[in-house]
């Protein structure tokens, strides 16, 4: 590569990036360097470091889209310099966002008349969308309590222990008590009966998850709605439901159209969905839509005019790129209902291929269900010598990024591996992954147990540990061990399960 800067007497080799002073010396890490460098050198230095990142296509921990068509890539690059918040300057982009909101609201069966505009907003992801929905519920609850002359300083929200961290953030940041329904082995989603039991007069809403991060399972929103209807009748309360459909919102309408989880249920007042997951758009784009205009309090909507015109806004952030909004509209009109259904069908079929391949090894228990988000969550049948964290670590050698994690309370003694099936995960990749799992298991069989042999026979005060105690101890050890393991570039060897 030839550098753009003319060579000087002090550096005759400046014409070659790899022979120049720019790669002979360490690049600045903590302070802005005093001098400029040629653009080719800057590109090459950064590009070389980025090679140590994992391959996004082989990152099976993530639900986030990692491939789009070249035509959509082109549209995104052509609009990358547009600030989405500047509605007056970019009216067409604003119109495209409104079209997306209307399409998604109708996809979720919002009670809208012909030509009636839906109520919703684009966000940077489902985390922001969940927080906006939560703020609307909190303000609605406060307004009702104030009107009745009742205390409004102790709001709570009910959900399962399988929630995404964004809901925990909402509760902590906006001072709302989080009431979690504990999980149990074999049942890794919120139990609607237990959730409704936890509802009281201070509950601003119950959050149901359509597509658990842990297992991909859809929670029973219809049963939750029916139970809440009965409780509301008995108590005189009006406890509503929010559906976190970050993963499942672009799956259920196409694969399970008869499943009632959305605005067909009267207590569902708002729904969020991630466009950058099964909406098939690169990160980060999310959406939140409300059932009716009255479900979003007017006082939460701000009006600004310093960008040239009066603009309503209800977001936690302000400036953001418009590329993802444009890409979402591209996917909606490019694929249509037929295209989305075909993509989701293919994901489900590839999930079944992987699931059956893992079952045939005879080494795994499948934890996830066949219906739901197309993923496979599974655990070792025999973890007496080696566990899931070791399997995940060794898969890295083949390029695969597969997360291993423990379940939340009260199922934290259960450890699983999880593979998310995205649009770009082919049948061939599924078959190769199964083969690589078998190679890893064969190699582990030839190795001595690194931890279990020492801990399995352990005793506490002369009393032998139960299998559950041993498993918890081993899992905690391995989680701590793997969390501290990094490659030579400081990158963790095992991906976390966070994905918004």
Swiss-Prot record:
One of its GO terms (molecular function) is calmodulin binding. It is an enzyme of class 4 (lyase). GO terms for cellular component: mitochondrion. Its cofactor is pyridoxal 5'-phosphate. Gene3D superfamilies: 3.90.1150.160, 4.10.280.50, Type I PLP-dependent aspartate aminotransferase-like (Major domain). The modification Phosphoserine is found at residue 8. Expressed at low levels in siliques. It catalyses: L-glutamate + H(+) = 4-aminobutanoate + CO2. Keywords: Calmodulin-binding, Decarboxylase, Lyase, Phosphoprotein, Pyridoxal phosphate. InterPro entries: Glutamate_decarboxylase, PyrdxlP-dep_de-COase, PyrdxlP-dep_Trfase, PyrdxlP-dep_Trfase_major. Homohexamer. Interacts with calmodulin. Belongs to the group II decarboxylase family. This is Glutamate decarboxylase 3. The gene is GAD3.
């Amino acid at each position: 590569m030839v550098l753009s800067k003319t060579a000087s007497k002090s550096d005759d080799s400046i014409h070659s990036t790899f022979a120049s002073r720019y790669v002979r010396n360490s690049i600045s890490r903590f302070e802005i360097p005093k001098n400029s460098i040629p653009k080719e050198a800057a590109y090459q230095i950064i590009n070389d470091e980025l090679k140590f990142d994992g391959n996004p296509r082989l990152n099976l921990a993530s639900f986030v889209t990692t491939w789009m068509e070249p035509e959509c890539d082109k549209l995104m690059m052509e609009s990358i310099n547009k600030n989405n918040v500047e509605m007056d300057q970019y009216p067409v982009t604003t119109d495209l966002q409104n079209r997306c909101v209307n399409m998604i609201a109708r996809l979720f069966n919002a009670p809208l008349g012909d030509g009636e505009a839906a109520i919703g907003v684009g966000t940077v992801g489902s985390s922001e969308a969940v927080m906006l929905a939560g703020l609307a519920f909190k303000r609605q609850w406060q307004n009702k309590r104030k009107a009745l002359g009742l205390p409004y300083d102790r709001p709570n929200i009910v959900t399962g222990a399988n929630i995404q961290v964004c809901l925990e953030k909402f509760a902590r940041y906006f001072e709302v008590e989080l009431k979690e329904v504990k999980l149990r082995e074999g049942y890794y989603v919120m139990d609607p009966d237990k959730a409704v039991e936890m509802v009281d007069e201070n509950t601003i809403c119950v959050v149901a998850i359509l597509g658990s991060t842990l297992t991909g399972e859809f929670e029973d929103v219809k049963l939750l709605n029916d139970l809440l209807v009965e409780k509301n009748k008995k108590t005189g309360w009006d406890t509503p439901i929010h559906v976190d459909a970050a993963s499942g919102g672009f799956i259920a309408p196409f694969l399970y159209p008869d499943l009632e989880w959305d605005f067909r249920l009267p207590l569902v007042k708002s729904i969020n969905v991630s466009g950058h997951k099964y909406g098939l758009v690169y990160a980060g784009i999310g959406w939140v839509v409300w059932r009716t205009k009255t479900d979003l309090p007017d006082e939460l909507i701000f009006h600004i005019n310093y960008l040239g015109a009066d603009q309503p806004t209800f977001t936690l952030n302000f400036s953001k790129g418009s590329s993802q909004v444009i890409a979402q509209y591209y996917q909606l009109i490019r694929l249509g209902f037929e295209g989305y259904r075909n993509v989701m069908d293919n994901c489900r079929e590839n999930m079944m291929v992987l699931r059956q391949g893992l079952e045939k090894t005879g080494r795994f228990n499948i934890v996830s269900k066949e219906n739901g988000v197309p993923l496979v969550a599974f655990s070792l049948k025999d973890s007496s010598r080696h566990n899931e964290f070791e399997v995940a670590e060794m898969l890295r050698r083949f390029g695969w990024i597969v997360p291993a994690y423990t379940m939340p309370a009260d199922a934290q003694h259960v450890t699983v591996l999880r593979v998310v099936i995205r649009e770009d995960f082919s049948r061939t990749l599924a078959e190769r992954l199964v083969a690589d799992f078998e190679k890893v298991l064969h190699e582990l069989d030839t190795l001595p147990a690194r931890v279990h042999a020492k801990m399995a026979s352990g005793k506490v005060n002369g009393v032998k540990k139960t299998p559950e105690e041993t498993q918890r101890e081993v899992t905690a050890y391995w989680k701590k061990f793997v969390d501290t393991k990094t490659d030579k570039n400081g990158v963790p060897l095992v991906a976390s399960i966070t994905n918004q």
